Curated annotation (Swiss-Prot), chain A:
PANTHER family: BOLA-LIKE PROTEIN 1 (PTHR46230:SF7), PTHR46230. One of its GO terms (cellular component) is cytosol. It is found in: Mitochondrion matrix; Cytoplasm; Nucleus. This is UV-induced protein uvi31. InterPro entries: BolA, BolA-like_sf. Induction: Expression shows cellular growth phase dependency, with the maximal expression at the diauxic shift. Expression is rapidly decreased when cells approach stationary phase. By UV light. Expressed maximally (3.2-fold) at 4 hours after exposure to 240 J/m(2) of UV light. GO terms for biological process: cell division. Its main location: mitochondrion. Pfam families: BolA. Keywords: Cell cycle, Cell division, Cytoplasm, Mitochondrion, Nucleus. The keyword Lyase does not apply.
Swiss-Prot record, chain B:
The gene is grx4. This is Monothiol glutaredoxin-4. Residues 2-106 form the Thioredoxin domain. Monothiol glutaredoxin involved in the biogenesis of iron-sulfur clusters. Binds one iron-sulfur cluster per dimer. The iron-sulfur cluster is bound between subunits, and is complexed by a bound glutathione and a cysteine residue from each subunit. It is found in: Cytoplasm; Nucleus. Residues 147-244 form the Glutaredoxin domain. Glutathione binds at residues 164, 201-205, 226-227. InterPro entries: Glutaredoxin (IPR002109), GRX_PICOT-like (IPR033658), Monothiol_GRX-rel (IPR004480), Thioredoxin-like_sf (IPR036249), Thioredoxin_domain (IPR013766). Gene3D superfamilies: Glutaredoxin. One of its GO terms (cellular component) is nucleus. One of its GO terms (molecular function) is metal ion binding. [2Fe-2S] cluster binds at residue 172. GO terms for biological process: intracellular iron ion homeostasis; positive regulation of transcription by RNA polymerase II. Belongs to the glutaredoxin family. Monothiol subfamily.
Length: 102, 244
């Protein structure tokens, strides 16, 4: 039952689920920007352009002591399956620790 | 002496080999009378100025190069050192051009080591590649030959941008934005269109440990994508990283 639900879950929900389960997070905000990119040359021939481009704002204490690149790599690494499966871009517009937010 | 650019790779190679030198670019159009006049002036200044590279670039023929320097009208003269644009002189104004040469080139010449290689050597030098087949793997899991190629590419210029499309025709919004940001910051950069070579496109994801494009490298070091570069510009960090 759970497995079937997971497979019918959209990419946006899967990203949210993956990040919130793998990281301690104070905040995850995920925006679907796919509609802005569906007409671009690079998207030619892509079968489903509804869930290809997302924008993320994330706050996690686990980012403490990590460089920007390391924070982004951590998030990208957790979502490797999504990138392999058709996620084209995840803009991480903010990746902060709770201390950096306050 | 001044050198006429005849192909893009020649230009990129001169920039790569001339990192320590001051380079003066002359963007011109053969049909424009002011350009004809300024080309003569430019050639004379080139003869009189030692240890600087003077390049003539036909703007319409090399639209990608012209676009990356935001050339809207000719003649346009751009003075660069490393990855930084020192001055832009627009129009047929020999006095302004001479003033820029005196202001920037003469003081800098004393600071930088003169290279033994002449411009001609730089233009004609060919990078030798190992033609023996090499199927061994690099530590990151990439084929050694591809890994070496990516290493060469990421070091091909002080600042190297890997994007979808070209600076004049970016193929995605993120690439377009990053090109715009670099232009605003007057950053001179080399670029590679990853859509033209899938082995580079896929290989660079592993090489950089970064799954998306565009990707920016400075002095062979991975810096980040659009988000990180935007943040670095806001904080003034990017300018600090750029080579002098």
């Amino acid at each position: 039952m759970i497995r079937r639900f997971f497979h019918t879950m959209g990419r946006q929900d899967r990203i949210y689920k993956t990040l919130s389960e793998a990281l301690k997070t104070d905040k995850i905000t995920l925006y679907n920007d796919s509609y802005k990119h569906s007409h671009h040359i690079a998207m030619k021939g892509v079968p489903d352009t509804n869930e290809t481009h997302f924008r993320l704002e994330i706050v996690s204490p686990e980012f403490s002591g990590m460089s920007r690149v390391a924070r982004h790599r951590l998030v990208y690494g957790l979502l490797k399956d999504e990138f392999d499966g058709g996620l084209h871009a995840l803009q991480i517009t903010s990746s902060k620790t709770p201390d950096e937010v306050s | 002496m001044s050198v006429e650019i005849t192909f893009v790779e020649q230009f990129q190679e001169i920039l790569q080999n001339g990192k320590e030198q001051i380079i003066l670019l002359n963007f011109y159009a053969p049909w424009a009378a002011p350009c004809k006049q300024m080309n003569q002036v430019f050639d004379q200044f080139a003869k009189d100025t030692k240890n600087a590279v003077f390049l003539k670039i036909e703007a319409e023929k090399f639209s990608d190069i012209a676009e990356s320097f935001d050339v809207n009208a000719v003649p346009l003269f751009v003075l660069i050192h490393g990855a930084k644009v020192l001055a832009r002189i627009s129009g047929a104004n020999p006095q302004k051009l001479k003033a820029a040469i005196d202001e920037y080139i003469q003081p800098l010449i004393s600071q930088i080591s003169s290279t033994n290689a002449s411009v001609e050597t730089q233009v004609n030098s060919v990078q030798t590649t190992n033609t023996t087949s090499n199927t061994s793997k690099a530590p990151n899991g990439l084929d050694s030959e591809l890994n070496e190629r990516l290493s060469t590419l990421t070091n091909a210029h002080n600042v190297m941008l890997f994007l979808k499309g070209t600076p004049s025709e970016p193929a995605c919004g993120f690439s377009r934005k990053l090109v715009g940001l670099l232009r605003e910051q007057n950053v001179q950069y080399g670029f590679f269109n990853i859509l033209a070579d899938d082995s580079v496109r896929q290989g660079l994801k592993v090489f950089s440990d970064w799954p998306t494009f565009p990707q920016l490298y400075i002095k062979g070091e991975f810096v980040g994508g659009l988000d990180i570069v935007s943040e670095m510009i806001e904080n003034g960090e990017l300018q600090e990283m750029l080579p002098n």
